[in-house]
Amino acid sequence: MSALIEVSGLSKHFGGLQAVKDVSFAIEPGEIVGILGPNGAGKTTLYNLLTGFIPYDSGSVVFKGRDLRGLAPYRIAGLGISRTFQLCRPFVGMTVFENVIVGGLGASGGGGSGLDAHAHALLKQVGLAGKEQLAVETLSYGDQRRLEIARALAAKPALLLLDEPFAGLGSGEIADLSALIRRVHADQGLTVMLIEHKLHEFMRLVGRVIALDFGEIIAEGSPEDIVRHPAVIEAYIGRGDAEAEEQTNAA
């Protein structure tokens, strides 16, 4: 099976800071792949590069066999990559239903009664049926998270990038949203990339993990392998007591 998305040697500098360094990976259709790393590891910057929000300095991103270099975000979305954001970004001044409609305008075959029906179906799927005409500002934070997913799905993507969807949610809301992500993945045959710091739920959701630190891939493998990987442990909690003691005694 050929990769849905293939990233090769992707790099990005911001002045003297290298935010993403020579990142390469491939994702097969139907996978749920987690992007793991401490704050500042380059995870969201990677999403921004994949979706055209910022240009990369070198490397390539090939999606469905097409090189994405230089394409605007709306063009990339039209090809089948949708995303959510760390902080909810609803279109204020619009209703819940209108937010989903806007998300679907660039989809192939979007527009008209078909888009309306698709939007209603998505709102039902994410648990927002009956709230279509509410102003988005009145939604709870948990419902705004659900709306973000519905709006991303309105574009009928093949690849969905979720950026910390559990941030700011309670344990019950996290469990419900996790179940929703599983249903969406199964029902629509989506490929999913997931950034998340709620590691317990993260590790239960994903089938494979790519771990970043300082913009570089430091490990890749199953969730079980990643949580035991020395480079990942060091990136999150630093050197172990034994190593620290050994260096202190040697000083």
Explain the meaning of each model-derived region:
Residues S2-A251:
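Glycine-rich phosphate-binding loops of nucleotide-dependent enzymes
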